[in-house]
Regions:
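Metal-dependent nuclease catalytic cores that hydrolyze phosphodiester bonds in DNA/RNA
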Residues: 1-96
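Acidic, carboxylate-rich catalytic segments that either coordinate divalent cations
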Residues: 192-201
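Short linear sequence elements within intrinsically disordered, low-complexity coil regions
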Residues: 27, 57, 71, 139, ...
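General "foldedness" signal
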Residues: 56-62, 121, 159-161, 196
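Mg2+/Mn2+-dependent nuclease catalytic core
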Residues: 82-187, 191-192
Length: 201
């Protein structure tokens, strides 16, 4: 969002408006660009889901994106039976989610953002907390986890980032601690409801 605000400030002409009006215009432009980026990311996710489910034959820029992602997966993961947008639940811990792409060996999450080849940092550790939560909600055996970064402004530019298995327990501790805080703030413990249902059943 900060980057979008900076970009908006760079393109909004301040020659003919006062300072307050210019600031308002920058904020308006920043919000518009943020919404557009979010919608573009959702559309790319939906397109990839349809392609991996073999419901769509992509064309144009979509074809460039899908074939780049597919090739990247083959290089880094080998041949896999991928399942797209799979819902998982950890009833014991009381959380769930939807995985972008999963197989018997891998959990993959897509991230769309504007970047070019050679961009310095795309992966941030907080992304691993989401992935390890998905991984711990799945049945054995343990799975490897990775993000695929998809350029929204350079179709076909994709980057694969696998997270180190040696850090999995630490990622899980951080996620579990954050989940506990969230539940206590919200006063919401779905796992207790699950136990009550099991007892009554």
């Amino acid at each position: 969002k900060i980057n979008k605000t900076i970009e908006a400030a760079a393109i909004v002409d301040r020659s003919f408006i006062d300072s307050d009006a210019w600031k308002a215009k920058v904020i308006e432009e920043s919000k518009r660009e943020t919404i557009e980026a979010s919608e573009r990311g959702s559309r790319i996710h939906d397109m990839l889901e349809s392609c991996f489910k073999k419901e769509l034959e992509p064309t144009g820029d979509d074809a460039s994106i899908f074939h780049a992602v597919d090739a990247l997966l083959k290089v880094n993961c080998g041949e896999q039976n991928w399942r797209s947008e799979e819902v998982v639940c950890n009833l014991q811990k009381g959380y769930g989610g939807m995985i972008d792409l999963v197989s018997d060996e891998w959990v993959i999450d897509f991230k769309t953002k504007e970047f070019t080849t050679g961009s310095k940092q795309l992966a941030y550790e907080s992304m691993a907390y989401q992935l390890i939560a998905y991984e711990r909600a799945l049945p054995a055996p343990p799975k490897r986890i990775a993000n695929i970064f998809i350029s929204a402004n350079n179709p076909g530019v994709v980057v694969f980032h696998e997270w180190n298995e040696a850090d999995f327990n630490r990622y899980w501790t951080i996620f579990e601690s954050s989940l506990t805080v969230w539940k206590n703030v919200k006063k919401y413990w779905p796992e207790r409801h699950n136990k009550e249902e099991e007892s009554s059943g």
